[in-house]
A protein has these predicted regions:
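Helical scaffold of the NTase/Pol beta-like nucleotidyltransferase catalytic core
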Residues: 1-35
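Membrane-proximal basic amphipathic "stem/tether" segments
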Residues: 1-5, 133-213
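Internal, conserved structured core segments that host functional sites
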Residues: 82-148
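Extended, basic/helix-rich recognition subdomains
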Residues: 186, 198-257
Protein backbone atom coordinates (compact mmCIF):
# COMPACT_ATOMS: atom_id res chain seq x y z
CA UNK A 1 0.00 0.00 0.00
CA UNK A 2 1.24 3.48 -0.87
CA UNK A 3 1.31 5.79 2.17
CA UNK A 4 0.80 8.80 -0.12
CA UNK A 5 -2.82 7.66 -0.59
CA UNK A 6 -3.55 8.03 3.14
CA UNK A 7 -0.93 10.62 4.06
CA UNK A 8 -3.24 13.01 5.93
CA UNK A 9 -4.79 10.30 8.10
CA UNK A 10 -1.40 8.62 8.62
CA UNK A 11 0.26 11.84 9.84
CA UNK A 12 -2.66 12.64 12.16
CA UNK A 13 -2.41 9.20 13.76
CA UNK A 14 1.35 9.23 14.37
CA UNK A 15 1.12 12.79 15.70
CA UNK A 16 -1.52 11.60 18.20
CA UNK A 17 0.84 8.80 19.27
CA UNK A 18 3.63 11.34 19.81
CA UNK A 19 1.29 13.41 22.00
CA UNK A 20 0.38 10.29 23.98
CA UNK A 21 4.07 9.53 24.52
CA UNK A 22 4.60 13.11 25.70
CA UNK A 23 1.76 12.78 28.23
CA UNK A 24 3.11 9.49 29.56
CA UNK A 25 6.62 10.90 29.92
CA UNK A 26 5.42 14.11 31.59
CA UNK A 27 3.36 12.07 34.07
CA UNK A 28 6.42 10.05 35.06
CA UNK A 29 9.22 12.60 34.72
CA UNK A 30 10.82 10.96 31.68
CA UNK A 31 12.68 12.80 28.92
CA UNK A 32 12.96 12.14 25.20
CA UNK A 33 14.29 14.11 22.25
CA UNK A 34 13.17 14.02 18.64
CA UNK A 35 15.94 12.69 16.43
CA UNK A 36 16.91 12.01 12.81
CA UNK A 37 14.34 13.14 10.21
CA UNK A 38 11.86 14.12 12.91
CA UNK A 39 14.39 16.60 14.32
CA UNK A 40 15.03 18.01 10.85
CA UNK A 41 11.28 18.31 10.39
CA UNK A 42 10.98 20.29 13.62
CA UNK A 43 13.70 22.78 12.65
CA UNK A 44 13.15 23.06 8.89
CA UNK A 45 9.40 22.45 8.51
CA UNK A 46 8.03 22.92 12.05
CA UNK A 47 6.38 19.54 11.62
CA UNK A 48 6.62 16.21 9.84
CA UNK A 49 8.79 16.35 6.72
CA UNK A 50 6.27 16.24 3.81
CA UNK A 51 7.71 13.00 2.39
CA UNK A 52 8.55 11.37 5.74
CA UNK A 53 6.39 8.58 7.14
CA UNK A 54 7.43 8.15 10.75
CA UNK A 55 8.39 9.86 14.00
CA UNK A 56 11.60 8.90 15.79
CA UNK A 57 12.72 9.81 19.30
CA UNK A 58 15.72 8.99 21.47
CA UNK A 59 15.40 8.40 25.20
CA UNK A 60 18.27 8.28 27.72
CA UNK A 61 18.79 4.70 28.91
CA UNK A 62 17.78 5.33 32.56
CA UNK A 63 14.46 6.84 31.41
CA UNK A 64 14.03 4.14 28.75
CA UNK A 65 14.42 1.36 31.34
CA UNK A 66 11.90 3.11 33.58
CA UNK A 67 9.44 3.35 30.68
CA UNK A 68 9.72 -0.41 30.13
CA UNK A 69 8.88 -1.02 33.80
CA UNK A 70 6.01 1.49 33.79
CA UNK A 71 4.50 -0.19 30.72
CA UNK A 72 4.32 -3.51 32.59
CA UNK A 73 2.12 -2.02 35.29
CA UNK A 74 0.19 0.83 33.70
CA UNK A 75 -2.64 0.75 31.17
CA UNK A 76 -1.97 3.25 28.38
CA UNK A 77 -5.52 2.98 27.04
CA UNK A 78 -5.57 2.53 23.27
CA UNK A 79 -1.78 2.69 23.18
CA UNK A 80 0.73 -0.04 24.00
CA UNK A 81 4.50 -0.22 24.25
CA UNK A 82 5.78 -2.86 21.83
CA UNK A 83 9.15 -4.26 22.94
CA UNK A 84 11.37 -7.22 22.08
CA UNK A 85 10.76 -8.61 25.58
CA UNK A 86 7.04 -9.27 25.30
CA UNK A 87 6.49 -9.95 21.59
CA UNK A 88 8.32 -12.92 20.08
CA UNK A 89 7.41 -11.81 16.56
CA UNK A 90 8.89 -8.35 17.04
CA UNK A 91 12.32 -8.40 15.33
CA UNK A 92 13.86 -5.16 16.65
CA UNK A 93 15.77 -4.11 19.77
CA UNK A 94 14.13 -0.76 20.31
CA UNK A 95 10.54 -0.05 21.30
CA UNK A 96 7.50 1.48 19.66
CA UNK A 97 4.52 3.19 21.20
CA UNK A 98 1.72 1.77 19.09
CA UNK A 99 -1.94 2.63 18.54
CA UNK A 100 -3.91 -0.58 19.11
CA UNK A 101 -6.89 0.69 17.09
CA UNK A 102 -4.77 0.59 13.92
CA UNK A 103 -3.03 -2.25 12.12
CA UNK A 104 0.02 -2.59 9.93
CA UNK A 105 2.59 -5.17 8.90
CA UNK A 106 5.85 -3.32 8.37
CA UNK A 107 7.86 -5.97 6.49
CA UNK A 108 6.96 -9.07 4.54
CA UNK A 109 10.24 -10.85 5.35
CA UNK A 110 9.97 -10.23 9.11
CA UNK A 111 6.21 -9.88 9.59
CA UNK A 112 4.98 -8.46 12.88
CA UNK A 113 1.41 -7.22 13.21
CA UNK A 114 1.24 -4.04 15.30
CA UNK A 115 -0.44 -0.64 15.11
CA UNK A 116 0.88 2.63 13.77
CA UNK A 117 3.73 3.75 15.97
CA UNK A 118 6.38 6.15 17.15
CA UNK A 119 9.89 4.65 17.33
CA UNK A 120 11.64 5.00 20.71
CA UNK A 121 15.40 4.41 20.51
CA UNK A 122 17.35 3.91 23.75
CA UNK A 123 20.31 6.29 24.07
CA UNK A 124 23.13 4.46 25.82
CA UNK A 125 26.28 5.56 27.59
CA UNK A 126 29.40 4.49 25.74
CA UNK A 127 33.18 4.70 26.01
CA UNK A 128 34.85 8.10 26.36
CA UNK A 129 37.35 6.98 23.72
CA UNK A 130 35.69 7.45 20.32
CA UNK A 131 37.57 4.57 18.67
CA UNK A 132 36.47 2.19 21.42
CA UNK A 133 32.91 3.49 21.12
CA UNK A 134 33.04 2.72 17.39
CA UNK A 135 34.27 -0.81 18.06
CA UNK A 136 31.37 -1.31 20.46
CA UNK A 137 29.03 -0.13 17.71
CA UNK A 138 30.55 -2.71 15.35
CA UNK A 139 30.07 -5.51 17.89
CA UNK A 140 26.51 -4.47 18.54
CA UNK A 141 25.72 -4.29 14.82
CA UNK A 142 26.88 -7.89 14.38
CA UNK A 143 24.44 -8.99 17.07
CA UNK A 144 21.64 -6.99 15.41
CA UNK A 145 22.44 -8.67 12.09
CA UNK A 146 22.14 -12.08 13.74
CA UNK A 147 18.81 -11.08 15.26
CA UNK A 148 17.64 -9.92 11.83
CA UNK A 149 18.77 -13.21 10.26
CA UNK A 150 16.82 -15.44 12.63
CA UNK A 151 13.77 -13.16 12.42
CA UNK A 152 13.54 -13.40 8.63
CA UNK A 153 10.87 -15.82 7.41
CA UNK A 154 11.84 -17.61 4.21
CA UNK A 155 9.30 -19.19 1.89
CA UNK A 156 9.42 -22.92 1.12
CA UNK A 157 10.73 -22.10 -2.35
CA UNK A 158 13.57 -20.01 -0.92
CA UNK A 159 14.55 -22.89 1.39
CA UNK A 160 14.60 -25.26 -1.57
CA UNK A 161 16.82 -22.88 -3.53
CA UNK A 162 19.36 -22.95 -0.70
CA UNK A 163 19.22 -26.74 -0.62
CA UNK A 164 19.76 -27.26 -4.35
CA UNK A 165 23.25 -25.71 -4.43
CA UNK A 166 26.27 -26.99 -2.49
CA UNK A 167 27.40 -23.36 -2.15
CA UNK A 168 24.36 -22.54 0.00
CA UNK A 169 24.11 -25.71 2.10
CA UNK A 170 25.72 -23.88 5.01
CA UNK A 171 23.09 -21.14 4.87
CA UNK A 172 20.37 -23.81 4.65
CA UNK A 173 21.72 -25.48 7.80
CA UNK A 174 21.81 -22.16 9.67
CA UNK A 175 18.29 -21.26 8.55
CA UNK A 176 17.01 -24.69 9.60
CA UNK A 177 18.66 -24.42 13.01
CA UNK A 178 17.23 -20.93 13.44
CA UNK A 179 13.75 -22.19 12.51
CA UNK A 180 13.73 -24.79 15.30
CA UNK A 181 15.72 -22.81 17.90
CA UNK A 182 14.59 -19.27 17.06
CA UNK A 183 13.20 -18.39 20.49
CA UNK A 184 16.26 -19.58 22.42
CA UNK A 185 18.69 -17.89 20.04
CA UNK A 186 16.64 -14.70 20.10
CA UNK A 187 16.64 -14.56 23.91
CA UNK A 188 20.40 -15.09 23.99
CA UNK A 189 21.03 -12.27 21.49
CA UNK A 190 18.77 -9.89 23.42
CA UNK A 191 20.68 -10.69 26.63
CA UNK A 192 23.92 -9.85 24.84
CA UNK A 193 22.51 -6.52 23.65
CA UNK A 194 21.19 -5.76 27.13
CA UNK A 195 24.63 -6.37 28.57
CA UNK A 196 26.35 -4.04 26.11
CA UNK A 197 23.72 -1.36 26.66
CA UNK A 198 24.49 -1.26 30.39
CA UNK A 199 28.30 -1.41 30.29
CA UNK A 200 28.71 2.24 31.25
CA UNK A 201 27.15 4.55 33.83
CA UNK A 202 24.94 6.99 31.94
CA UNK A 203 25.34 9.77 34.50
CA UNK A 204 29.15 9.64 34.33
CA UNK A 205 29.48 9.11 30.58
CA UNK A 206 31.05 11.70 28.29
CA UNK A 207 29.71 10.13 25.10
CA UNK A 208 26.44 8.41 24.21
CA UNK A 209 25.29 6.41 21.24
CA UNK A 210 22.20 4.88 19.72
CA UNK A 211 23.34 1.29 19.20
CA UNK A 212 20.15 0.48 17.29
CA UNK A 213 20.39 3.52 15.00
CA UNK A 214 21.08 3.24 11.28
CA UNK A 215 23.67 6.02 10.89
CA UNK A 216 26.79 4.04 11.77
CA UNK A 217 29.52 5.83 13.68
CA UNK A 218 27.55 9.08 13.53
CA UNK A 219 25.35 7.59 16.24
CA UNK A 220 28.18 8.34 18.70
CA UNK A 221 28.15 11.92 19.99
CA UNK A 222 28.89 13.98 23.14
CA UNK A 223 26.22 13.70 25.82
CA UNK A 224 26.60 17.42 26.55
CA UNK A 225 24.86 18.20 23.25
CA UNK A 226 21.58 17.07 24.83
CA UNK A 227 21.58 19.58 27.67
CA UNK A 228 18.11 20.48 28.90
CA UNK A 229 16.78 20.41 25.36
CA UNK A 230 15.30 23.10 23.12
CA UNK A 231 11.60 23.31 22.29
CA UNK A 232 10.37 23.65 18.70
CA UNK A 233 6.86 23.97 17.25
CA UNK A 234 5.79 20.75 15.55
CA UNK A 235 2.49 20.70 13.66
CA UNK A 236 -0.07 21.68 16.35
CA UNK A 237 2.16 20.81 19.32
CA UNK A 238 5.76 21.25 20.47
CA UNK A 239 8.70 18.85 20.72
CA UNK A 240 12.07 18.77 22.45
CA UNK A 241 15.34 18.56 20.52
CA UNK A 242 18.90 18.37 21.88
CA UNK A 243 19.88 21.76 23.27
CA UNK A 244 22.79 21.97 20.83
CA UNK A 245 20.57 20.78 18.01
CA UNK A 246 22.58 22.48 15.26
CA UNK A 247 25.78 20.60 16.15
CA UNK A 248 23.78 17.41 16.56
CA UNK A 249 22.06 17.67 13.17
CA UNK A 250 25.19 18.76 11.30
CA UNK A 251 27.03 15.81 12.83
CA UNK A 252 24.45 13.48 11.30
CA UNK A 253 23.41 15.22 8.09
CA UNK A 254 25.76 18.08 7.23
CA UNK A 255 23.75 20.97 5.76
CA UNK A 256 20.40 19.73 7.02
CA UNK A 257 18.58 22.89 5.94
CA UNK A 258 19.25 22.03 2.29
CA UNK A 259 16.36 20.09 0.74
CA UNK A 260 17.34 16.71 -0.77
CA UNK A 261 16.94 16.07 -4.51
CA UNK A 262 13.35 15.39 -5.56
CA UNK A 263 14.10 11.73 -6.34
CA UNK A 264 15.17 11.19 -2.71
CA UNK A 265 11.96 12.58 -1.23
CA UNK A 266 10.30 9.21 -0.71
CA UNK A 267 8.72 7.26 2.13
CA UNK A 268 11.04 4.61 3.53
CA UNK A 269 8.85 1.94 5.12
CA UNK A 270 7.94 -1.34 3.44
CA UNK A 271 4.30 -1.84 4.38
CA UNK A 272 2.15 -4.76 3.29
CA UNK A 273 -1.06 -4.10 5.27
CA UNK A 274 -2.53 -0.95 6.75
CA UNK A 275 -5.76 -0.32 8.64
CA UNK A 276 -5.86 3.11 10.24
CA UNK A 277 -9.55 3.49 11.09
CA UNK A 278 -10.90 2.67 14.51
CA UNK A 279 -13.14 -0.43 14.52
Amino acid sequence: MDIKDIKKEWNAKILDILKALTRICEDHGLTFYCCAGTAIGAVRHHGIIPWDDDIDVIMPRPDYDRLLEIAKKEDFGKYELVTPYDNEAYPLYFSKLSDKTTTLVEERERPCVIGLFVDIFPLDATDDDIDKAHRLKDRYTKIINRLNAISTRNTFGEYMQLLTSTKTWGRFAIKTLAFFCRSAIRRRLIRQMDGMSHLYDYEKAKNVQVYTGSYGYREVFPKEWLGKGKTFPFEDTTVLLPERYDEYLRHFFGDYMQLPPVEQRIEKHNLSLIHISEP
